[in-house]
A protein has these predicted regions:
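Coupling/switch/interface segments within P-loop NTPase motor domains and analogous charged loops
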Residues: 1-9
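Conserved alpha-helical "signature site"
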Residues: 3, 180, 202-447
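Bacterial c-di-GMP phosphodiesterase EAL domain
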Residues: 4, 15-120, 127-130, 134, ...
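Long, contiguous hydrophobic alpha-helical segments, chiefly transmembrane helices and signal peptides
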Residues: 40-47, 53-60, 80-81, 99-103, ...
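Short, well-ordered alpha-helical scaffold segments within catalytic/effector domains
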Residues: 78, 82, 132, 136, ...
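Amphipathic alpha-helical segments in well-ordered regions
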Residues: 80, 84-88, 146, 357, ...
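A generic secondary-structure signal
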Residues: 87-91, 141, 188, 209, ...
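The catalytic core of metal-dependent phosphodiesterases that act on cyclic dinucleotides
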Residues: 112-223, 345-348
Length: 447
């Protein structure tokens, strides 16, 4: 790649090395509390009607108990959860929202629960809990301490008044109930001032139906599902950004062609100049043109930056959580590369994570988008699930999806095949979230 820059080489040599996929973040304290390092923790978003994140359900599982059915049901699990809050700050997972945490019956009366911060903690009472006097008393105490209570997987219309009088939220599993049941539950409990949460919402149609029924909160992967439309319906900036992405990911980068495409997108030009002139580079003279900026960036940095900068426009009509999820996947994939012996493929793994939700952003089949961008081979195979399941890139992508879903048994099997230590995975996940939060706030992602 020939340089287009007019900034002097000596000036460039004096600038600090900083890459979008290697930000200057504080790593987790070392050593981290052993109890924390031995637990997996994942998050699943809960949305309001405007598709803003209301909170996250946190999923915990001790690493050593990958195959244990009741690993989350013991008092020891509460110790792990409270240690996690105290020693590492699980609030870093919450982005200023609320934590929904599952409580089986034996944890409701455990006084260690009071070490969890009442503000922003929603205690989910599992469906296996029976509303006996001890449970009612424990729930009343938790409520008096300031905790918000929610009933999980609830389907009772009668006989639970003493417990439902204490809760603020009722979760209804849309995979385990009929439409009639969903409506009846919403009608009965909304009338009593209880907020209804529709769980396991998988399509945008289900989301709209739940809204019409009176549900206020929604959990599931519906926000990451594409609503397929015809190619000609993709207009304006999205189409322009797709052209830039396609040019950036050609095997041979043509800077003059890329410069011409970027010039057509005023917002992308502005983002590029803000990025290259950020204080972290420390240029003596400001960079004033696209040509200069591209000349100062390496090929991989150009590709990564354009991919990142394109996300807000491609997902402009989608929930912010879609962008956050793509960013977490990208960084998580890249961090796992080293531990899986794939350091030489970390840029490809970063791209796989970043592009894994392009179909939802553009409402087009992913295979069609990847073909247009010219992405083939094991990168496309990993994204489409069309290659051998034992391909390393596909395995890492599968591990990340398993982590997101809290499929701990599958995760442990995949980690073993990749020879990735189980106890490092949560560290990498939290680092990926911290990085995504930083990038999300950077000016390169502003509209």
């Amino acid at each position: 790649m020939s340089s287009l820059a007019t900034v002097s080489q000596s000036e460039a040599a004096q600038s600090p090395t900083w890459r979008l996929n290697q930000p200057q973040l504080q790593r987790l304290p070392d050593p981290v509390d052993k109890a924390f390092m031995e637990v997996f923790v994942a998050r699943q978003a809960i949305f309001d009607r405007r598709l803003k994140v209301y909170g996250y359900e946190l999923l915990f599982r001790p690493c050593r108990d990958c195959t244990s059915a009741d690993a989350a049901g013991s008092a020891a699990s509460l110790q792990v959860i409270t240690n996690s809050f105290l020693s590492i700050g699980i609030e870093k997972l919450l982005a200023g929202t609320r934590a929904f945490i599952n409580f089986p019956q034996d944890l409701l009366s455990d006084e260690r629960a009071f070490s969890l911060p009442p503000k922003g903690t929603v205690i989910e009472i599992l469906e296996s809990v029976k509303p006996d006097p001890a449970v009612i008393s424990a729930c009343r105490t938790l409520r008096e301490k300031g905790y918000t209570l929610a009933l999980d997987d609830f389907s009772h219309l009668n006989g639970w008044d003493e417990l439902t009088d204490l809760v603020s939220i009722i979760k209804v599993d849309f995979r385990a109930t009929t439409i009639d049941q969903q409506q009846a539950l919403a009608s009965r409990y909304s009338a009593r001032g209880i907020r209804m949460l529709a769980e396991k919402i998988e399509t945008i149609e289900e989301f709209h139906r739940a809204c019409e029924m009176g549900y206020q909160y929604f959990q599931g992967y519906f926000f990451a599902r594409p609503v397929i439309v015809s190619r000609r319906e993709i207009r304006g900036n999205k189409l322009g950004y797709l052209r830039v992405l396609k040019e950036a990911h050609r095997p041979e980068l043509e800077l003059f062609a890329l410069e011409a495409l970027i010039q057509r997108e005023v917002s992308l030009t502005s983002k590029l100049l803000r990025y290259i002139n950020s204080p972290v580079f420390g240029w003596i003279n400001p960079v004033q043109s696209i040509r200069q900026a591209l000349g100062l960036m390496g090929e991989q940095e150009i590709r990564n930056w354009i991919s990142l900068a394109a996300l807000p426009t491609l997902a402009s009509d989608k929930p912010d959580e879609l962008i956050r999820t793509a960013l977490v996947r990208a960084r998580f994939s890249e961090l796992l590369a080293k531990w899986a012996g794939l350091g030489h493929r970390k840029a490809d793994l970063f791209l796989i994570g970043l592009f894994s939700l392009l179909d939802a952003m553009l409402n087009r089949p992913l295979a069609e988008i990847l073909a247009e961008l010219g992405l083939r081979g094991d990168i496309a195979d990993a994204l489409l699930g069309t290659g051998r399941p034992d391909q390393p890139l596909a395995e890492i992508h599968a591990l990340i999806r398993q982590y997101e879903a809290g499929d701990w048994e599958a995760l442990c099997r995949t980690a073993a095949r990749l020879r990735v230590p189980k106890d490092i995975i949560v560290d990498l996940y939290l680092e990926a979230i911290a990085w995504s939060d930083q990038i999300f706030q950077e000016s390169i992602l502003s509209h």
